[in-house]
Amino acid sequence: MLLISDLAEHTKNLGADTRASLLFDGTVGMDNPLTGARVTVTGHLAPSEDPALIARYTARHPGSEMYLGFADFHLYEMTVDRAHIVAGFGAIHWIESADLLFDAEGFEDLAAAEADVVEHMNADHADAVGLYATKLLGRPQGDWKMTGVDPEGIDLRCGGETARLDFEKT
């Protein structure tokens, strides 16, 4: 999901061609970034008005609610085609979306209950949510809140800091 203004040049470009790519760079702080991991995800962007996706996005990015109220801001959902992964110098691969993305089929009940699960955990188990962040992820003490849950893990937020706790694979 991307929140984009209609006034932005890239949004105008999307009107002519919906193809897009996003770079995720894991090389911050490395002495030699060429040896670090990064992935470019390619696909197509389309506007989304799905209430569940909007709720998930605004829970993860609380400041975005203000912009969603503006007539010229819209959420776009990317349909991923494939990814170009550089896992370090010379370790380069193309991966198709089916091998990259989690197949959420069979988890519709979790998606439908996500808001209730998050509300319950924050209201009744705030101490546990804080421990997830501090003990399991090594994050600093703070008022950690759960912002999302999906079949692969949970999303946490404390002020401007976010964290992801992945579930163990079985």
Task: For the regions a language model picked out, list residue spans one by one.
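Active-site-proximal cofactor/substrate-binding loop regions of enzyme domains
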Residues: 1-5
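Short, structured beta-strand-loop surface elements
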Residues: 7-73, 79-82
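C-terminal edge-of-domain segments
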Residues: 69-170
